[in-house]
A protein has these predicted regions:
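N-terminal charged helix/coil linker that caps or initiates catalytic domains
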Residues: 1-25
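Glycine-rich phosphate/adenylate-binding loop
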Residues: 21, 109-116, 121-129, 136, ...
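Conserved N-terminal Rossmann-fold NAD(P)-binding element of oxidoreductases
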Residues: 27-29, 52
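Conserved S-adenosyl-L-methionine
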Residues: 43-48, 136
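Glycine-rich phosphate-binding loop and adjoining beta1-alpha1-beta2 segment
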Residues: 46, 51-89
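Conserved SAM/SAH-binding loop
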Residues: 98-106
Length: 244
C-alpha cells in the first residue's frame, strides 16, 4: 500500500519531502483563505504548523471555509484546523494560538522561529504589523489581499505589493507599507473589480479557496527553492516516460 505522501514524493523527491517535514510555517488566520493554506501545507507534508485565530466557526462560514461544517459550528477555528491536520498527517506538529494578532498580542510570537509566515488575516493593522515583524526577523512572508466580493478565481496573481492593481486592500497596503519604509512584500491579489461594496463582503466557495491554494503553492516552492522543485518535477516526468 502506498503511503499517503507517495504521490507528492513522485513530484518533489525524497530530499524535498524531508525538507518540508523539517519546515515550520506560521499561518495567521485560518478562515476562507487561511484554512485552505493549512489544508494544502498539511497535505504537502509540512512538519510544523503554528496556527493563530481567535474566531469560532459560524454558520455563515460554511459557504466558503474548509474548516466549517455543521459539526464544527461553535468550535474555535484553530482547534478544528489542528484536528483536521492530525487526521491528514499525524506526524505534523501543530501549535495553536486562540488569539487575534494585534499590537497587544504581538509579543506572543518570535518570528525567528519560523521558516515562513502566511498572512491570511483581515485587518490592515494586523497585516502591516505582520509584515513589519517578519521583515525585521528576516523571515519570508506572503500576504493574501482581498478575496471577498469576487467571482473570478482565475484573476488571482502573485506579485510584489507595489506591482498590484485594482485590489482596494492592496492599494491601502501599498500606501501604509511605503510610510513604514517596507520596500517589498510578496502578495496574492485579484485583478477582478469588486462586484459590490458593502459592510459585509459577499463570498463564494471557489474564490478564497483558490487564493489559499496559490498561497500554499508559493510557500512550498519558496521553502524548497524554485529551481529544486522544477528539477524534481522534470526528473519525475522523465522517470514516468521511461516506464511507458
Amino acid at each position: 500500500m502506498e503511503s499517503w505522501s507517495e504521490r507528492t514524493k513522485q513530484l518533489l523527491g525524497s530530499e524535498n519531502m524531508e525538507k518540508l517535514a523539517r519546515s515550520r510555517v506560521a499561518v495567521f488566520g485560518v478562515g476562507g483563505v487561511g484554512g485552505y493554506v493549512v489544508e494544502a501545507l498539511a497535505r504537502c507534508g509540512v512538519g510544523f504548523l503554528d496556527l493563530t485565530d481567535a474566531d469560532v466557526v459560524a454558520p455563515s462560514n460554511i459557504n466558503r471555509q474548509i474548516l466549517a461544517t455543521v459539526s464544527t459550528i461553535g468550535r474555535p477555528k484553530v482547534e478544528a484546523a489542528r484536528d483536521r491536520v492530525r487526521d491528514i498527517n499525524p506526524d505534523c506538529r501543530v501549535k495553536i494560538h486562540k488569539i487575534f494578532y494585534l499590537p497587544e498580542t504581538a509579543d506572543h510570537f518570535d518570528f525567528r522561529e519560523y521558516d515562513y509566515v502566511v498572512d491570511a488575516i483581515d485587518t490592515v493593522s494586523g497585516k502591516l504589523m505582520l509584515a513589519e515583524q517578519a521583515k525585521a526577523a528576516g523571515t519570508p512572508i506572503i500576504s493574501s489581499m482581498g478575496a471577498g466580493n469576487k467571482l473570478d478565481p482565475t484573476a488571482f496573481r502573485v506579485a510584489d505589493i507595489y506591482e498590484t492593481k485594482v485590489c482596494p486592500l492592496a492599494k491601502v497596503m501599498r500606501r501604509e507599507l511605503r510610510r513604514r519604509g517596507i520596500e517589498a512584500l510578496k502578495v496574492v491579489y485579484s485583478e477582478e473589480e469588486p462586484l459590490k461594496r458593502g459592510r459585509t463582503p459577499g463570498s463564494v466557495s471557489f474564490v478564497p479557496s483558490v487564493a489559499g491554494l496559490i498561497v500554499a503553492g508559493e510557500v512550498v516552492k519558496d521553502l524548497l527553492g524554485r529551481e529544486a522543485t522544477r528539477l524534481s518535477s522534470e526528473l519525475s516526468l522523465c522517470r514516468m516516460e521511461s516506464n511507458i
